[in-house]
Amino acid sequence: MKHRLAAVLLAPGKPCDPPRLGCSPAQPGALAAIPAVVFSGSMDGHLRAFAAGDGKLLWDFDTAKPFDTVNGVNATGGSLDGAGAVISGGMVFVNSGYPRFGGMPGNVPLAFGN
């Protein structure tokens, strides 16, 4: 089975051409978008940013790994499911770790910005 990331034109309800291959087949969480960029978390722990216009992969960050934290406690990320990324003040926020439905456990809040 081939998986694809596709944009849909709302008025006719048809996919834009061409569809992009290679997205994760397990992207159950809510999408988050800003002008020209769509963020998608997946069960493999990756947070990906796609160009809204053509679906091109712009950025990919693996959250399913150990992290040093500001309070010195080790934390581990996992699957990204449920709520999507929150975008505010030029930053993107996610919580990594979701053990339900076969996901990878963890519990680490992450913030991305310039």
Cite the ranges covered by each PLM segment.
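Extracytoplasmic/lumenal domain signature
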Residues: 1-27, 32-82, 86-114
